[in-house]
């Protein structure tokens, strides 16, 4: 629920395919830089249309500490509300929405290509990661 995030800056990271090479690379890059996000008082929440057990296995496999939420049923409903659902394939697109404490989206980092990762330089710039 969106009210769960009121009062917190949050980075909502949508992913299409847990356990795929591009998504694996992105999740590991986020994991490896999580301290920079925390230093900016920003919570990280990942969302996929995969089922909860798949997301838990993925998080465990890569030692992920931030939550990975299942937008499984109704299928892709949260992704649709954010405007990042691909109807033809039935997946979340690679969009990251950064919100302020009032749940207002202040920045979007995205890749419109399913098989192309987001440019991590955008995260580095936003969060002063060297």
Report residues per predicted region.
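Chalcogenol-based redox active-site neighborhoods
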Residues: 1-130
